[in-house]
């Protein structure tokens, strides 16, 4: 059962779409009305589609699937990181590097380099270098951590991605579709829902709305893992 109400969504401004002149006609089925030249999203549909999406994410989580949270714009960045960490999943919140999914072999080499530099910074190697060389390596480490820190322990491609703002994250969506990775996304009235497997119509600009989505997703994933562990414990006890 989805721990989210219509009241929660209204208070967070989930229903506010973009100005009508910026709309994508493919979002018409999810629009309730126009008000002051702004499209109002049909929250009854949002609630239903959110529940469908969370049920599917729960299934992926229960089988220990890897879920990648993606949101690189300023309004989403910090919440993306915190939500992924909260449910022990993965994230990209700084900048999407082209080929992060479709060129995983190269990304894996960069992750290897990141881990080497992390190790060197902790074991005293940096202190043995010249100031200039230590500075260069520190900058490289910080750059790699910003870009790859959220996926350095992913160990392979994700089983699903959850995206805030499909218009802003077009490259990651294109890559996921190319590889057949299921996409769960918040889709605003200015975006095209056609390439998204699990559409959740909603405001993708409001910080309060973004926080609400991510808290719901994170807790859903976290709770599904807890319930799965409890089921497994009962099976073990029963067999013994």
UniProtKB/Swiss-Prot annotation:
Keywords recorded for this protein, A-Z: Ribonucleoprotein, Ribosomal protein
Name assigned to this protein: Small ribosomal subunit protein uS2
Keyword Isomerase attributed: no
Organism: Wigglesworthia glossinidia brevipalpis
Pfam families xrefs: Ribosomal_S2
GO cellular component term, pick one: cytosolic small ribosomal subunit
Cross-referenced NCBIfam families: rpsB_bact
Family the entry assigns: Belongs to the universal ribosomal protein uS2 family.
A biological-process GO annotation: translation
InterPro entries: Ribosomal_uS2, Ribosomal_uS2_bac/mit/plastid, Ribosomal_uS2_CS, Ribosomal_uS2_flav_dom_sf
């Amino acid at each position: 059962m989805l721990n989210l109400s219509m009241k929660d969504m209204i208070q967070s401004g989930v229903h506010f779409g973009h100005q009508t002149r910026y709309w994508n006609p493919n979002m018409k089925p999810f629009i309730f009305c126009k008000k002051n030249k702004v499209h109002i999203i049909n929250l009854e549909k949002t609630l239903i589609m959110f529940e469908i999406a969370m049920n599917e994410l729960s299934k992926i989580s229960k089988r220990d699937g890897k879920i990648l949270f993606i949101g690189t714009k300023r309004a989403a960045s910090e919440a993306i990181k915190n939500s992924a960490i909260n449910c022990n999943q993965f994230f990209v919140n700084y900048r999407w590097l082209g080929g992060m999914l479709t060129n995983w072999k190269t990304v894996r080499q960069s992750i290897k380099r990141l881990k080497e530099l992390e190790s060197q910074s902790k074991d005293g190697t940096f202190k043995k270098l010249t100031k200039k060389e230590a500075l260069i390596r520190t900058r490289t480490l910080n750059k790699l951590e910003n870009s790859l820190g959220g996926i350095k322990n992913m160990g392979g491609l994700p089983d699903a991605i959850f995206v805030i703002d499909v218009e802003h994250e077009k490259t990651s969506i294109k890559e996921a579709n190319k590889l057949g990775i299921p996409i769960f996304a918040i889709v605003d009235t200015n975006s095209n829902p056609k390439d998204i497997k699990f559409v959740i119509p909603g405001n993708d600009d409001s910080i309060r709305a973004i926080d609400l989505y991510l808290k719901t997703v994170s807790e859903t994933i976290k709770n599904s893992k807890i319930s799965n562990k409890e089921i497994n414990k009962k099976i073990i006890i029963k067999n013994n």
